[in-house]
Amino acid sequence: MEKVPMTANGYAALQVELKQRQTVDRPRIIEHIAEARSHGDLSENAEYHAAKEEQSHNEGRIADLEDKLARADVIDITKLSGDTIMFGATVTLVDEDTEKKAVWQIVGEPEADAKKGRISITSPLARALIGKKKGASVEVMAPGGAKAYEITKVEWREPS
């Protein structure tokens, strides 16, 4: 079983979602199925089929969460330091063409969320950053072509 690196906050968030799906969503869906079943003929009962589909989706997500939690290698990034970029680092980059600044934290795949500034350790950008230090330049292949960035800051903090 391959371990998946994850921050403590990412692990806790997955635990919260799992508990919600098991203790709140699952009983609610079972109730919907029972109610729809009471309406008679199941072959033409759209409400019943929708509830069964929701149940299937929920159970699949529960299995996925349980797998991710079982394989998690929780890394306490508050105990990490230094100026070399690795898992958990929060990195400030400046686009060398546009001078636009961006801040990214390198996290495990299950907790990656670009809208929240968190990129997966397996992403092309993270792979280009790993092992680099403040002041270095990196080139990343993006959908629109190669992009060059300067690393202006490396920090260590839990994702928010």
From Swiss-Prot:
PROSITE patterns with a match to the protein in the record: GREAB_1 (PS00829)
Function summary: Necessary for efficient RNA polymerase transcription elongation past template-encoded arresting sites. The arresting sites in DNA have the property of trapping a certain fraction of elongating RNA polymerases that pass through, resulting in locked ternary complexes. Cleavage of the nascent transcript by cleavage factors such as GreA or GreB allows the resumption of elongation from the new 3'terminus. GreA releases sequences of 2 to 3 nucleotides.
Domain of life: Bacteria
Ranges in coiled-coil conformation: 49-73
Biological processes annotated in GO: DNA-templated transcription elongation; regulation of DNA-templated transcription elongation
Similarity field: Belongs to the GreA/GreB family.
HAMAP family: GreA_GreB
InterPro entries to which the protein is assigned, alphabetical: GreA/GreB_C_sf, TF_GreA/GreB_CS, Tscrpt_elong_fac_GreA, Tscrpt_elong_fac_GreA/B, Tscrpt_elong_fac_GreA/B_C, Tscrpt_elong_fac_GreA/B_fam, Tscrpt_elong_fac_GreA/B_N, Tscrpt_elong_fac_GreA/B_N_sf
Protein name: Transcription elongation factor GreA
Keyword annotations: Coiled coil, DNA-binding, Transcription, Transcription regulation
Molecular function terms, GO-annotated: DNA binding; RNA polymerase binding
